[in-house]
Amino acid sequence: MKKFSELKVGDEYQSTCTFSKKEVEAYLAFSRIKNTIFDDDEYSSIVSGRAIISRMEGEFTRLSQIYGNMILLYGMDGDPKWENRNTRFLKPLHVDEILKIKYTISDKKDQDDEFGMITV
């Protein structure tokens, strides 16, 4: 675990994960967000973008550098400092494909010696 003072703007961390069919179904049941397109056999193996984002947030909290810190996740899309852009994916992710995730610390604000806020 890194202390807040050790995290630097520009630090990059990577993780990988996959989604099983069972995990996708569990997420959709929990979130109650399901696009009817996923009922079509042609699209049923595609992982929902919201499920991917949820997993990315979870994977971030499990990084050895982050694990053990108090994490409060808030906001994601439409940040004025990010020119109000929204999260987009380059291509669909299918069940059992490997998702490669790269996190980059793009901003850091100190609150005091121990606490602060990072933008990833």
Regions found by a protein language model. Give the residues of each.
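Hot-dog-fold acyl-thioester-processing enzymes
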Residues: 1-84
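Hydrophobic beta-sheet segments that form the core/acyl-binding groove
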Residues: 80-120
